[in-house]
C-alpha cells in the first residue's frame, strides 16, 4: 500500500469508461442537518482541481451491469455521497440530500486508449469534483487489452465527503459488492449495511464547535502552540519550505515521493520496543522521524500538526466521510541522546546500534507531546481558527496510519491497491504520511520542487532507512545503556 499521485500508478492500455452518479433536480430534499465548520471552511478555501481517491485492479472479469449495481450500492450505503450544498437566501450554505432510489449511476464509454493516453486522461476524469457541485465522487474503469488479471477501477472524491480511512475502506467494500452483484445478489441486499452517516456526525460536530469560546482553553491552547502572529510552524531546516515569492512560485507543482523505509520485521521490532516503554508504534515512528530530522538538519525541536481520526462512535467506524481532527505536537528532544550510536564492530568498522536509554527518552517525549495535544482533536479547528483569528494553515503535517487491520488489507498487494491524492502546489508545505502495512513501513511525502528541498528529503529518507536498519532480527542488538 502506497499513497501517491495517480501519475505514479502503472495504468494499462484499454477501454476507459467513466461512471458518474446522477439524480433528477426534483428529487433533492431540503436537509435541516447543519454543515460542520470544517465543511464550511472547505467550501470557502478549497483549491480547484483538488481531490483524493483510490485505485485497484478488481479481480475477475469485467461486467458493466454488476459494476453499476456495486457502485450504486456503495453510494446508497453512505449518505454523505448523496448530499450536497446550495446557496441560501442569505448567501450562506444549506444542505440538500437525495434518497438512494433517486440516484442512478451512468456510464460513458470513452473508448480504447493507449497506456500513455489513459495516464493523461484519468486524472482529469477523477478531478471533475468540487465541494460546491454534486456529484462529489466519480469513478472510472479501464479494461485492459489482456483482462486475465481483472480490470482497473478508480475513484476521485472531494475532501468534503472523504478521508484517508474512507479511501482504505473502499477497496474491500467495492470488491465484495462487485462479487456479490455478479452472483446475482438482489439490490436491497447489496445496499444493506448498518453504518452511521457522516451527515449526522457533521451536525453533532457543529453543536460541539458552537460551545467553544474565544477565551476558552482549546482556543488558547492552539494560540499558544502557534505563537506570535498565530502562524503555523515550518520545517526547521533552512530552504526546505518558504513562503512563495510570487504567483509563479505559488503555482509551482510540488514534488511527490513514496519510499519504503522498513520491513515488517523491523517495524514490528520498533513497535514492540515502543510498547515495552508504555507507548505505541506511532510514538516509535515519530521518534525515528525526529531522530532523522535532528541528525540531518540539526533540529532539536519539531512542531507539527498530526491529523487524527474522530471516529469515536462505533457506528462511524466503517462510514465514508471526513472524520479528521488536528493534534498540535510540540516535540523537544533537547538533552536526549541520539537513538542510534556507533560502536566498534571490529574488522568491519563502526556500526550503528539502538541506544536503549535514548530510545526510551525519545519515545516518552513523543508520547507526552502527542498526549498533550490529543484532547484538542475533537474540537473543530475551523471554529477555533475563527474564534482565535487564525488565518494561516499547516505548513508541516505528519500523519501515521496503521492500515493492517482495515478490512481486506491482507489482499491489497494482490489487488495492486493504492490510495491517491491530487497534485499540490507551492513552496510553503511539507507533508509526510507514514503508513504501516502488511508489507512494512512506507512514507509518502510532498514538498517544494526545489533543489534544496530535494536534497533535504533525500537525506531525511536515507537517514530514516538507516535508523530502521538497526531494528529487527537482521539488524544489530540494542546497546547496553
What is the predicted function of each stretch?
Residues 23-30, 47-66, 132-155, 243-313, ...:
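Gly/Ser/Thr-rich phosphate-binding loops and adjoining beta-strand/alpha-helix segments
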Residues 29-45, 115-121, 256-272, 424-437, ...:
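AMP-binding/adenylate-forming domain of the ANL superfamily
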Residues 1-47, 69-113, 195-255:
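Short amphipathic alpha-helices and their capping loops
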Residues 2, 46-51, 68, 79-80, ...:
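His-Asp-centered acyl/peptidyl-transfer active-site segments
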Residues 2-4, 37-59, 88-112, 133-138, ...:
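Acyl/amide activation-and-transfer machinery of modular secondary-metabolite enzymes
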Residues 2-8, 108-115, 126-199, 456-470:
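Active-site-proximal acidic secondary-structure segment that organizes catalysis
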Residues 1-30, 59-76, 92-136, 338-350, ...:
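A short, small/polar-residue-rich loop/turn motif at beta-strand boundaries
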Residues 78, 82, 171-172, 300-307, ...:
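Extended, hydrophobic beta-loop-alpha segments that form or line the acyl/peptidyl-thioester binding
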Amino acid at each position: 500500500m502506497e499513497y501517491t499521485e495517480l501519475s505514479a500508478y502503472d495504468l494499462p492500455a484499454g477501454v476507459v469508461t467513466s461512471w458518474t452518479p446522477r439524480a433528477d433536480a426534483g428529487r433533492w430534499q431540503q436537509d435541516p442537518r447543519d454543515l460542520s465548520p470544517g465543511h464550511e471552511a472547505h467550501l470557502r478555501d478549497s483549491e480547484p482541481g483538488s481531490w483524493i481517491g483510490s485505485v485497484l485492479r478488481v479481480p475477475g472479469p469485467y461486467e458493466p451491469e454488476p459494476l453499476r449495481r456495486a457502485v450504486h450500492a456503495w453510494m446508497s450505503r453512505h449518505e454523505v455521497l448523496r448530499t450536497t450544498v446550495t446557496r441560501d437566501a442569505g448567501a450562506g450554505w444549506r444542505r440538500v440530500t437525495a434518497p438512494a432510489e433517486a440516484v442512478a449511476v451512468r456510464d460513458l464509454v470513452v473508448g480504447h486508449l493507449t497506456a500513455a493516453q489513459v495516464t493523461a486522461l484519468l486524472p482529469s476524469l477523477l478531478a471533475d469534483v468540487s465541494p460546491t457541485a454534486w456529484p462529489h465522487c466519480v469513478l472510472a474503469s479501464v479494461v485492459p487489452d489482456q483482462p486475465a488479471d481483472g480490470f482497473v477501477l478508480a475513484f476521485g472524491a472531494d475532501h468534503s465527503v472523504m478521508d484517508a480511512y474512507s479511501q482504505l475502506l473502499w477497496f474491500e467494500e467495492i470488491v465484495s459488492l462487485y462479487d456479490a452483484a455478479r452472483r446475482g445478489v438482489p439490490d436491497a441486499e447489496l445496499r444493506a449495511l448498518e453504518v452511521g452517516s457522516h451527515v449526522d456526525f457533521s451536525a453533532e460536530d457543529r453543536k460541539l464547535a458552537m460551545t467553544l469560546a474565544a477565551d476558552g482553553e482549546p482556543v488558547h491552547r492552539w494560540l499558544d502552540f502557534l505563537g506570535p502572529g498565530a502562524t503555523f510552524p515550518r520545517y526547521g531546516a533552512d530552504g526546505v519550505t518558504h513562503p512563495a515569492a510570487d504567483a509563479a512560485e505559488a503555482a509551482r507543482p510540488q514534488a511527490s515521493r513514496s519510499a519504503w523505509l522498513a520491513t515488517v520485521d523491523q517495524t514490528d521490532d520498533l513497535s514492540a520496543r515502543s510498547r515495552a516503554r508504555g507507548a505505541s508504534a506511532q510514538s516509535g515512528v515519530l521518534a525515528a522521524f525526529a531522530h532523522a530530522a535532528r541528525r540531518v538538519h540539526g533540529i532539536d525541536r519539531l512542531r507539527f500538526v498530526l491529523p487524527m481520526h474522530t471516529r469515536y462512535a462505533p457506528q462511524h467506524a466503517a462510514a465514508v466521510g471526513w472524520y479528521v481532527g488536528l493534534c498540535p505536537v510540540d516535540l523537544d528532544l533537547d538533552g536526549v541522546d541520539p537513538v542510534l550510536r556507533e560502536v566498534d564492530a571490529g574488522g568491519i568498522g563502526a556500526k550503528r546500534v539502538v541506544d536503549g536509554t535514548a530510545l526510551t527518552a525519545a519515545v516518552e517525549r513523543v508520547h507526552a507531546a502527542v498526549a498533550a495535544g490529543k484532547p484538542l482533536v475533537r474540537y473543530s479547528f475551523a471554529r477555533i481558527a475563527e474564534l482565535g483569528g487564525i488565518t494561516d494553515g499547516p505548513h508541516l503535517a505528519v500523519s501515521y496510519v496503521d492500515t493492517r487491520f482495515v478490512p481486506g488489507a491482507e489482499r491489497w498487494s494482490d489487488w495492486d491497491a493504492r490510495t491517491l491524492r491530487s497534485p499540490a502546489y507551492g513552496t510553503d508545505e511539507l507533508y509526510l504520511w507514514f503508513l504501516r502495512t502488511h508489507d512494512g513501513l512506507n512514507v509518502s511525502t510532498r514538498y517544494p520542487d526545489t533543489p534544496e528541498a530535494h536534497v533535504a528529503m533525500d537525506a531525511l529518507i536515507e537517514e530514516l532507512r538507516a535508523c530502521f536498519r538497526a531494528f529487527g532480527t537482521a539488524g544489530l542488538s540494542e546497546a547496553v545503556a
